């Protein structure tokens, strides 16, 4: 098979291979041949690195070469060629099932065919891939590491369009790319840099080996190291890693095709495209890291393949391994390293002194040696050790007479293993520095000897287990006898002192402690005989073993919180004893005396009486002395007593008290005069855990009594069981210590501690004995047990256990109140403080503190009168006209006047009411109609009264109200008092209006309308603009600002200056000061400039100070300096004053001022003159100086042209310089950037408008036309500019002159103003003080006059110059007027044409995109508007409803966004409202819970009050009986009693009502013997008739109130919730019969839901009990009113039922009205509840039911029917109760009528 243009021996593009490449191939073959020669030692290996020869790595490794795709491997496969040859056959067959054979199988194209061979006609064999497979891999797997240098591939077909070469150095685990090859690198391998590479390790993509030509024998060559790239270090690890390979892979990724496969996917088309490779050459050599020059066949590799590059290195430099990658065994002294040029890096042999043949390398050792040696010897022999076997092993030492390499150099140590260190180890070698001697034994610390075989002195017991060898003699120096040997050398036993024992003399003998250097060594324990359990103690601390709660080393102290009981601790108070007829005598203790008794007091024991003491809780079984404490009643009193002990049973003979006989339990004693205690003559034996009764009987008594004094027995205080301590073992022992203790106890009479309650201070002798006694008796100390409420601390006195009590508290534990105190609690006890005037005794009840009161006295301390009385101790009834129940206890002034009354006796109406409530007149207090009554929201009067003449009510209006009924707002006030809740408020006008002016403020809003005192604002709270001050103080003054120093924006004129409204500070210009802005700040000047003051800027060293003249700015210069700031030379000089000043050299004929330029010396020339000295005519002027005249008018035109050309020339020069420096780009960078920006704008407009190419072209053409026209117009305008330039110059000069005149004029005006100001000052000042001002003003005026004359009359003067300039300007303008008009006309025509052309341009497309319509219609008819269209408000109109433009869309989006924002805001508001409602609901629920809990607490507290109230009621009934049955009970009194009884509120249950009704009926029936007192009632009957008339009038008023009752029917349910429907129904029937109007009002309260509650039964009961005497003042006429009340109640009850019916129909509509009315009724309900305080328990159930109804009504109105049923049930009960009450009232009326008819 032949390929087009294919010719052997040619490279790419058919060219012959270069001779260098051919020579390289030949050398490679030669090297491969030499590699197979016998091994010879190349001299280069001894001097540095050496490398094996290079060859073809494929030779001999055909079996390691694989391809991922080969044609015909499984079956024959046809393929075709692309050729222009004349051969007819173009398609062939591939059959690679068998290897290639030129004779037998020439069509086999396996991958092994590419291995180089020198067989003839080798082009007949090649490798070929399958048809149409673009991704093919050729891979070589080597058996070891090799150096890879380059690769040559010769293709039979087209070279691949894309391929890459990869390598692996770890046998295929990881791969790295060498090079990419592609016809189109950017498409096949994006992101890969393009060739050529810049560095030797760059991975690039190369295109020169991927072109489609040549079609055959094209080559691909790759070199790992490009010769053109310098390599800095060829031996570096990176270079070695780049060359090292174990696998090489060629990935063919894309085929070259002719494009027909894209159009025709048939198999025949794909048969032309495949990969075919003639030859593959992979050059390299064996990789040995420079340690070998030859290689041998690797294990498993063919050994005799011709030309094969073997893989197993024949290593040099003491290395080993397949690639010489390791050091040989025993050559590990240096780290392995690749060989380098000039350095072999050979592995070095380990130094082990001939004691081993094995070692290893240790990097840590190598680094520690400074990179010198890292070999560590392994398995040292001959008893050696160390890194180099240079030391002897432990327990061996080096023989100094032998060499280290001698096998017998190390000898064993000869040391006693028990006494030497480390079990017999010796020094291994000599080292004078370390003090080592070879073979020397190292003894333990306490061992000596050559072989360490004996102990040191003072030590014993040589042992191998002891780390120190021997033990020190364990002898305590404090317990050892000094001067002798410490211990036995063998046993270690020490020699001890007399009181010391133990093996080491380290312990004291029993009963001793404190081992020390004393002669005896220890001290006795000396434990307390009572406080310690035994005489033993701790040897170290001496601490004895203490009994319970005893502390101290000797147990002689009491633990804090515990105490040592006194000998009289076992005390039984007589007050607590039992006995018949015993009298307890309590006694108060004064602060100044010490009580001689215990407990509250005494028990009086008379002859023959017995008192029985119950004795329990004794501490131990022993004899007790019986001690009786008493107090005589008469002088020299004596008594005979008998004490009998009653035991619970017979005494056991084996018990401690088994020796007691029955006769021993009866003891008699005699009380002698002048004694306070008795010790019975014989003790008694008692045991713990048994209860005894000790009965004390008074047999007889006598004494020296006064004749009037009788014997009253004895006062017994207490009985004390005092332990008979002398029988204790501490006193009764036979030792000397016990005898000494007893002698001391008796000598110092220590037993007398328990005789009397008062304790004397203990002596130092008795105190320890008593502590020991008490510890023995009570087995230690007793706990304080201080009562936490009555004591100040939990600790008590250690002697006796008395706790620190709070005030008023007594007892050892502070657990009871002292006599005369009560109320034991956390604060202690309170003193009784019984009133000496009202109490029978100074002692009170211990719990409540109630003192025993005298008759008439009342209260806890009996210190005030009963309720309803005053004047303690002479109590008398309160006089309150029946309007109050209590009065001041001291003055008698009534408290809590009812029915709107007030005054000391409730004799007048309170504010807001009128009438005469005094009893003789019986009037009522009625509300003042101003315009409504008090309590309403429309009551605006302080008081009112009835006019005696007109009988009209006259209102005294509150401030701010006026009118007959105070129904309007007064002047100076606003509001609408006619509306509910409306009121008049003071117009807040800061006192700046006329309070009498009705139009001063708005009567509805309160806005101030007529502000005075230069104020303004809605409240006249601000000064007017131009005024300042405090508006609230009427002190607004006009702003007085200096115009020159004030900001003109804030002060346009003197009449309207805006200063600070509070301080009057004017808004000053910069650096202007003063309240009126009238002077410069310090160091500033030029106040008259009108722009603020300028800094003086005086030179710091050349001026005398920083200040300058306020008007001229001239600083005060030192001599030789001048200028305004003194920084220049002095006048008429110039130059640098620091160097030299020169005189000005100016021609006086040409200057306009004598001073030249201070820096340059240039003279200031007058117009038309120039030159340095001003001695020449200036440019544009002609003539001979000084006569200089202006040039012709044409000079200005040409001069403008010349100046313009000069400017352009300068710009061109600048551009040329920039071109030379930065090039074209730099010179025109700004232009380019400008053009780029405009192009970007054009592109944005084009893309935004989506303009077509045609429209764009038209726009461009139109733009060019406009640009051309504008250019022409610009040229014409330039000409006009040139013509006007001269005019402008002249005009400028004229303006300059006029500006000078203007400044002069301003200065003159300023001078005039200043003179005016000075004149004003002179008017108000003295003449002498103003003289200087006048003189200064005169000088200024003279100077001003001179300057004005110079400006007007001087030649030349500014005025004459201005006139000349004006004339020249007029001539010039007249001359150019015609040309100007002609040019102007031409410009107008050009602009017209441009305007017409502009009108032809259309923006309809843009208008349609933006606004939604083309915009060609007029704005008035255009639905969407457009450019130039405006709405009625003058705003641009674009878009709208139905318009789809961008503007409409944006408006729609904006509208939706705003709507969404509004919705979100509304949602937030609603959410906040919901949150607040939830919070309010939660708060109400918590309040309801609190109210319920409070109600429950009150119910529990009232439980006990009910029984007390019942008892009081029973007592009250009995008092009523007694009062009514006694003689002298008149009808008034009887009627008052009945009325008060009826006034009692009916209790909750019908049974209680029945019981009360029965009692009232019984009381009425019991009235008798009243005929005798009829004569006393005549006057009362007449008053009763008057009251009857009042009752009739009240009834008529009640009928008028019927309408009001109907209007409040809707409030029934809500009022029932507040007070309880049932409670209101029951209580509403029991009305107060005392007053008809009050009865009617309470019936109306029943209709409205119990608006006011009745007084409680218990309260009324106490009032009735206290006012029995006052009842006689009441009137019998009230009985008639009761009948009327009965009828009214019946009609009211029927109206209530009708209201209930209407309520069910209207409750839905009137719920809000009910709620409002209920809130107004709440105050009355609360007041009623306060008055019903004593009946809480009885009303609790009804109140709870009412609260339940309230909760259900708040939740839903669905429970309304249930409430209705409950109300009907209560109404039924009410009917029954009303029937019972009518029977009672009838009985009362019958009795009253009998009395009335008997007169």
From Swiss-Prot:
Residues 564-778 form the Laminin IV type B domain. Neuromuscular synapse and kidney glomerulus. Residues 1681-1692 have a biased composition (Low complexity). Residues 1339-1365, 1679-1701 are annotated as: Disordered. Residues 1-35 form the signal peptide. The modification Phosphoserine is found at residue 1533. Glycans are attached at residues 251, 371, 1086, 1250, 1309, 1349, 1500. This is Laminin subunit beta-2. The lineage of its organism: Eukaryota, Metazoa, Chordata, Craniata, Vertebrata. The gene is Lamb2.
